């Protein structure tokens, strides 16, 4: 087992309310045994102190109130900690090594020879790690409800604890009402702490071993090696299997326990650095404390820092979150609205979306409702959480959304002929544009200033930087371009130096380099404007932008521009007029697409087809147009869109983007600084 050390946790209850010293981390413990281990750690490393509370919820509340800083929690408690009233986030995951990594298997275990299966548990005595915990409660109870073993219609009918009490003969589920049947088998106070001997994995197993219960809901590593031969796993198909067959016989694979703290990157880094710096102490052993799994699981091999944008939803994943919600929220009743919630990025898109909502009313109900977020990544999160349903995004964002489990369902078509006679997949050309006569070529861009549509965008980042990376094999693009504007970078990056912000006299800097229309150099039009206003020497955009913005077609800032004032930079080192994009481009790439959750595909497609029949380019209702720039350029959809076309059902993001694009993306993903924090969070683990 890899030895990791956690810093000392000095402190005592009397100092709980004192403001922490600079660089101090206060760990929350839930029992005297954990406190003893915590104090022993304090003898090894300065900078930690201990805060004693009675259970996980009290620790969560203490961290929220800044009376403590961190605690390791299981998935069920991570969910609670992430709710709006606490707003904590997982920052470090336990790593169990081998194939488990930062996930583990939730299993049901019984003594060998007892001859009942998972579907025969009614009337049996059960041992649970704790009420609301992952392997001990949420997964087994959620599974039993799903397969119809436990009859429960939702909390509007009765609490799930009542249904579980009716199902099992008796139980020990620490954290339940002490006088209830769910505490009948417990040996101590039935609290969710080590004050209850049957609490946690080792306690639930002890409950089974002692004969108090007939089945224990635990994790796959709980049964000691010397005792495995005496126990068996209960599989969901009602068969049994040896303890080591957990990969094929388990209830679910769930995210590892994780350290949670407040949403403060500096505090998260401090906690991680303290843990990694501890020496001469085995952080993952509870030997000598007459208990197991104190502060961390004893089976932990390592600790892994999570991406800073990871929240409880991203860490736990949509499937596990759905399981928890099914046990804690009322089931949906009544008729739901036949509307889709569109996610608008920034104020300008929200204004257009609100107008769409008003015009979409049919028979007294709107077909489009609006949610807004500051960035596309935040919209993707909202769609994952079911707070929004859909948004149209560029190919790079389709890639990120796909990594987060969303799917492309409709694609923008820029050729009107193909709207009525679909054929080749909708696409556009990614191009590099410079001012005519600048002397620049594709091969002389090093040291110049660059204008990008945004970090992670197709034409503006992924294609040009992928080509540059393939040539230089250097991920530090600040050594290639001297500075530029690539909205989405940290504001102190050289790739934000040339960004303009909102242009407002008050509070404008807050929008600088933000990946939304509030940043004037964001998106296709913004990147072109960056070039026009001499903030950059080259703009990476799509082939239609120059003609759309020049020769009298553009906004005020582009009024006097001629398309002939600009030229394309070809990969062979030559330049060509902007009309020669078919011979002079960086790549031909998929058009922008509407993304949603897989289960929402049908409804989103149906409503959008209906909406474009009314408000599309050839729509029956002239009061609103989905694709015209009446509210500003390229809002909600590209202005060049002629129609939306359905993507064949079952198409995943990889198939939509195509092999060439996927190869380019995989190459660029060798550079961590070209991967968004959201994508890192979504791909951190897949349980």
From Swiss-Prot:
Residue stretches in coiled coil: none
Signal peptide limits: 1-18
InterPro entries, sorted: Transferrin, Transferrin-like_dom, Transferrin_Fe_BS
MF annotations from Gene Ontology: metal ion binding
Pfam families named in the record: Transferrin
Residues binding hydrogencarbonate 1: 129, 134, 136-137
UniProtKB keywords: Disulfide bond, Glycoprotein, Ion transport, Iron, Iron transport, Metal-binding, Repeat, Secreted, Signal, Transport
Positions of Fe(3+) 2 binding: 394, 428, 524, 592
Gene Ontology, cellular component aspect: early endosome; extracellular space; plasma membrane; recycling endosome
An example Gene Ontology biological process: antibacterial humoral response
Residue ranges of domain Transferrin-like in the record: 25-329, 340-670
Ligand binding (hydrogencarbonate 2): 453, 457, 459-460
Location, primary (coarse class): secreted
Disulphide bonds in the chain: 28-50, 127-207, 172-186, 235-249, 343-379, 353-370, 404-682, 419-643, 451-530, 475-671, 485-499, 496-513, 570-584
Positions annotated to bind Fe(3+) 1: 74, 104, 201, 257
Location(s), subcellular: Secreted
Glycosylation site positions: 169, 673
Assembly, per entry: Monomer.
Free-text function comment from the UniProt entry: Transferrins are iron binding transport proteins which can bind two Fe(3+) ions in association with the binding of an anion, usually bicarbonate.
Family listed: Belongs to the transferrin family.
Protein name: Serotransferrin
Organism lineage string: Eukaryota, Metazoa, Chordata, Craniata, Vertebrata
